[in-house]
Amino acid sequence: MQVRNILVALVVVCFAVSEAATQAPTSPPDSSASAEQVAQLLNAPSELDRLKLLKDNQFVFDFKNSKLGVTQSAGGKTVATSRTDFPAVIGHNIAMTVGFIEACGINLPHTHPRATEINFIAKGRFQAGFFLENQATFIGHILEEGMATVFPQGAIHFEINLECEPAMFVAAFNNEDPGVQTTASSFFGLPADVAAVSLNISSIQTVEDLAKYLPHNPAIAMKECMQRCGMTGSSESSESSEDSSCSD
């Protein structure tokens, strides 16, 4: 009788597994939080109180399928967590961005004003580098799959996919609100006369014209890479979906 019961139980389990396998894949969990919940989490008197404010699904963020925190253009997309998109990070001084970069794509030069970054190459091969401050020298690397590098807080840095197929990096931060400032677009966001003086250009119109040609992030990188990979078309990027998001 005991053997029979075990066999019946196995049949039931196998049937349940089979049924689950045939069901449509579930949609990514909605981990987002309202401004009110974020404020409550920030002001929680203890970690236990903060834990009670979160739902189970708010501890999971689906980088692959998320529609939150996405910046997308011709060179791929970056998906970044934030307090409102992934409230489980609140109080832990951590954040993350995953870059899904197309062949010859570049995550344009940018800074994180409030965080140091450690960047891990999950797939592919990247050229990466940073410039920290005046009188420093540029530091650059070729990073293979499985390697990592550090970008100090506030340093201008970038990542270029050197391969002819999509690649991926994972960037972690020591601040749940690292911020991001894309270098070129921020510079040309200054008053045109200030930008003109900085570039030693006399014509404000020239500065305004240059600003019109700035690519959106992530962009398609060097022509050499495009030629090597047999890619055709302009390296100019199309409009990004969310320029202000916290891309790496």
Curated annotation (Swiss-Prot):
| TM segment ranges | none
Predominant location category: secreted
**Residues holding Mn(2+):** 110, 112, 117, 157
Keywords from UniProt, A to Z, are: Cell wall, Glycoprotein, Manganese, Metal-binding, Secreted, Signal
What compartments host this protein? Secreted, Cell wall
Record-level Gene Ontology MF annotations: manganese ion binding
Question: Residues in domain Cupin type-1?
Answer: 61-207
| Top-rank lineage group of the source organism | Eukaryota
Residues bearing glycans:
200
Signal peptide per UniProt: 1-20
InterPro entries reported for this sequence: Cupin_1, Germin, Germin_Mn-BS, RmlC-like_jellyroll, RmlC_Cupin_sf
One GO cellular component term of this record is: extracellular region
Q: What else is known?
A: Spherulin is a major encystment-specific protein.
Homology family: Belongs to the germin family.
Name of the protein this chain belongs to: Spherulin-1B
- Supply the source organism for this entry: Physarum polycephalum
